[in-house]
């Protein structure tokens, strides 16, 4: 279940919530985990805001066996903090910057000499900076830019190496055409890229030359306004091509042998209207 509420008081905004999860394992073990979250924002007029967030997530280490072959029942825990600001230098344009720190404790660590035995005393850390810019640059041109830098560390061994992409960038540009046959048509071009990073297995880096490759992907959209008719009002036909050059890439990984591959070249057609 999930409970959450938001409170406004003058220039202050407060958020508090908690999620409860019941977990059951195939070995008939049971655990219940609480995951609270808090947030606070201080507005300075209409153009500047400072914010801070904190959250905790936990879940049992079901599915992992200890040295005696019994299922681990204690829980891993993730604590996350974020601090940042948002500012609007000009109308309809927002820039935001934040620092985040994510610490995982009590994660499963492989026992030396075993292929499927663990103890739950691992600790990992990911910290970094996220920057974003979005809004209307001109009357016809809107832009979205997001960049994230992440530094990861295995606190159990003290090693510092990337287990997720250290640099990630997303960019979207949209332009609306005024006048002519294409009046009202909106063209969009997107770009997504991520750095390479080390593949891991059983919580450890496999080898210096065993990495998840970097990738760059381009997307394109066009939104065409349709003439009004008896059946269609404010109708827009949307055409999209994602991964234009049909790039083969790994989008995300849990570990080296459990990866989510990116979508191949994908075509999408949509119709938006009111009745």
PLM region spans:
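Structural signature of Gram-negative outer-membrane beta-barrels, strongest in the C-terminal barrel
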Residues: 1-104
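Transmembrane beta-barrel architecture of outer-membrane proteins
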Residues: 1-2, 19, 33-36, 78-84, ...
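Transmembrane beta-strands of outer-membrane beta-barrel pores
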Residues: 9-11, 20-26, 54-60, 99-105, ...
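Outer-membrane beta-barrel translocator domains and adjoining extracellular loop/strand segments
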Residues: 26-34, 62-69, 107-115, 150-161, ...
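Membrane-embedded beta-barrel scaffold of Gram-negative outer-membrane proteins
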Residues: 43, 50-51, 75-148, 240
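Gram-negative outer-membrane beta-barrel transporters
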Residues: 8-14, 101, 119-202
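Repeated loop/turn-to-beta-strand initiation elements of outer-membrane beta-barrel proteins
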Residues: 11-14, 46-50, 91-95, 140-143, ...
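Conserved C-terminal beta-signal and adjacent last beta-strands/turns
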Residues: 41, 81-83, 162-275
């Amino acid at each position: 279940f999930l409970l959450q509420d938001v409170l406004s008081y003058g220039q202050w905004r407060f958020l508090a919530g908690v999620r409860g999860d019941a977990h059951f394992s195939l070995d008939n073990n049971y655990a219940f985990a609480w995951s609270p979250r808090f947030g606070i924002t201080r507005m300075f007029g209409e153009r500047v805001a400072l914010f801070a967030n904190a959250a905790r997530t936990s879940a049992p280490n079901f599915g992992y066996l200890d040295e005696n072959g019994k299922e681990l029942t204690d829980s891993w825990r993730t604590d996350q903090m974020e601090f940042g600001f948002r500012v609007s230098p000009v109308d309809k344009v927002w820039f935001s910057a934040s620092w985040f720190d994510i610490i995982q404790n009590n994660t499963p660590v492989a026992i030396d000499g075993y292929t499927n035995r663990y103890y739950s005393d691992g600790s990992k850390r990911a910290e970094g900076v996220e920057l974003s810019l979005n809004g209307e640059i001109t009357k016809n041109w809107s832009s979205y830019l997001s960049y994230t830098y992440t530094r990861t560390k295995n606190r159990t061994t003290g090693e510092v190496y990337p287990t997720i992409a250290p640099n990630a960038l997303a960019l979207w540009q949209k332009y609306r055409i005024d006048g002519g046959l294409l009046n009202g048509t909106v063209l969009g071009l997107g770009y997504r890229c991520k750095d390479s990073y080390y593949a891991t297995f059983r919580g450890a880096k496999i080898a210096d030359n065993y990495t998840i490759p970097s990738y760059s992907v381009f997307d394109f959209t066009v939104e065409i306004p349709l003439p009004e008719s008896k059946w269609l009002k404010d109708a827009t036909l949307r055409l999209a091509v994602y991964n234009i050059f049909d790039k083969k890439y790994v989008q995300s990984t849990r570990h080296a042998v459990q990866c989510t591959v990116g979508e191949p070249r994908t075509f999408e057609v949509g119709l938006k209207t009111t009745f």
